Amino acid sequence: MKKVKIGVLGGYRGSSMINYCVAAGNAEVVAICDKWEPALKRHQEIHPDTDITYYLDFEEFIKHDMDAVVLANYATEHAPFAIRAMKEGKHVFSEVLPCQTMKEAVELVEAVEKSNLVYAYGENFCYMPAPYEMKRLYEEGKIGEIEYAECEYIHNAEPIWHSITYGEEDHWRNNVYSTFYCTHSLGPIVHITKQRPVRVFGMESHKTERKLRIGAKSGQFAIEMVELENGGIIKSVHGHLYKDSHYYQIYGSKGRMESARPDTKSGNIHMLYVNADEYSGEYGEEKIEAYKPTLSHAEISKIFGHGGGDFYSMYYFVEKILGDKNADTIDVYEALDMALPGMFAYRSILAGGMPMDIPDLRNKEEREKWRNDTACSDPKVAGDMLWPVFSGGNPQIPEEVYKRMMLKHIEEFEANTGYVNAAFTQSSEQGVEAREHSNDIMMRDE
């Protein structure tokens, strides 16, 4: 079997993708690049008997003999690296998010179109058991056409913030606005229904206490109210509310389906409830189905992170490169359908809640309006179009907050404890288990 040669940019978040490549029958990792040398050393320890080349310098890495690049670098920097990789003739798997500005969005779309290469957006929440089964049911017409949906990605990252920002004041996580990181909530609904978001208004919490004490400048959570092209409505909630939750619900024209709420202890994102009539207007006896979906490659997918989503997003990416036109990847247009509602929700927030139309960059004429739009909250990118991180104005955070976070990160890393070390330990264990199941990954979907 031909194997796709893959390089991974970002040794920390990229660990799961690296393990997929090490274990897979359809791919192999040939290069890893990270500016943080300890990450490279950890992978050398985890994968001692492999022909992997390690790079600190991206310019050297991108010249390596490889077919594809996984972008697991900072979430605000994916578009420029994706464009560069495609110019070098590499297929691209992009972690979330696809771009930071509309200028980048236009350039990314045009780079993909020009390259004729595979661009896959790695929104792994789309491939978790419940939302992925919801996609299958929706496509077969189980609940009819979407009328309303709710989705939420709640992750109170305060306990691990020092580990994932290193105490750096200018780390992207401390400086993105509240609606930016929206595709873990919105993405699955877009992927399930294939309906394009056309209009949005946003709201953000003005409660910031928990964010300020960890050095983050945005509101604690945000809401996007999204209108779809068929007139359906989505309510998307995401951010740092106190207790974590991943949840998806869709009301269709003849029924409803939803994943389990986490506090029910019934399976969370692995459990699905379906209540649908045979036809709209039947109003017959309630027919509630409750079950844990079993997907293809279910056993091997359990080894990987995000409810198996890390497995399926990579598996389909590689299969698409190998020629499977039906491989369920998320292309650049769908990636922007997932991400632009967050960008334009913040424009709405800054405009006092005014609804905003969402551009469709499939339309070449529509691109011209946005070709030079650099508006974002990153001063290195925005130029004279800089947004505040928080609609109430950027808060002043004492330097001591970042010093405290940095010290805690260093202490844990040197003691081989904490979130980062646990992630690498999990990666090592994951890699061993994945290699034991490597033959499973060689199986093609029927």
Q: Whereabouts are the PLM-identified features?
A:
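N-terminal Rossmann-like dinucleotide-binding module
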Residues: M1-P48
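Predominantly a Rossmann-like dinucleotide-binding segment in NAD(P)-dependent oxidoreductases
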Residues: Y12, V118, F125-A216
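Beta-loop-alpha module in the N-terminal Rossmann-like domain of NAD(P)-dependent dehydrogenases
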Residues: P38, D49-A111
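C-terminal glycine/acidic-rich active-site capping loop/insertion
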Residues: N124, K254-D331, W370-E436, M442-E446
